[in-house]
């Protein structure tokens, strides 16, 4: 599948990109190159191959959960403009 100049102009318009006349041939070639790679990858026979969640079979070692900071909720509530029942009150922005 190859893109024509009019296709690239339409894509640029939809993406709100301002391309000048000098950029169109270069962008068209770049997009066609990318689509060529996609076509090449789609042509590979992947029957019988299990999809991978991650290309490397490595697992992260997780540290144990530990409280590292003190609870400063009361201090933050004290400097907030408005609070009620432990909640921050903010102006309504969507009606």
Swiss-Prot record:
Gene3D superfamilies: Glu-tRNAGln amidotransferase C subunit, N-terminal domain. Keywords: ATP-binding, Ligase, Nucleotide-binding, Protein biosynthesis. InterPro entries: Asp/Glu-ADT_sf_sub_c, GatC. It is an enzyme of class 6 (ligase). NCBIfam families: gatC. It catalyses: L-glutamyl-tRNA(Gln) + L-glutamine + ATP + H2O = L-glutaminyl-tRNA(Gln) + L-glutamate + ADP + phosphate + H(+); L-aspartyl-tRNA(Asn) + L-glutamine + ATP + H2O = L-asparaginyl-tRNA(Asn) + L-glutamate + ADP + phosphate + 2 H(+). SUPFAM superfamilies: Glu-tRNAGln amidotransferase C subunit. GO terms for molecular function: asparaginyl-tRNA synthase (glutamine-hydrolyzing) activity; ATP binding; glutaminyl-tRNA synthase (glutamine-hydrolyzing) activity. Allows the formation of correctly charged Asn-tRNA(Asn) or Gln-tRNA(Gln) through the transamidation of misacylated Asp-tRNA(Asn) or Glu-tRNA(Gln) in organisms which lack either or both of asparaginyl-tRNA or glutaminyl-tRNA synthetases. The reaction takes place in the presence of glutamine and ATP through an activated phospho-Asp-tRNA(Asn) or phospho-Glu-tRNA(Gln). This is Aspartyl/glutamyl-tRNA(Asn/Gln) amidotransferase subunit C. Pfam families: GatC (PF02686). Belongs to the GatC family. Heterotrimer of A, B and C subunits. GO terms for biological process: glutaminyl-tRNAGln biosynthesis via transamidation; regulation of translational fidelity; translation. Its EC number is 6.3.5.-. The keyword Nucleotide-binding applies. The keyword ATP-binding applies.
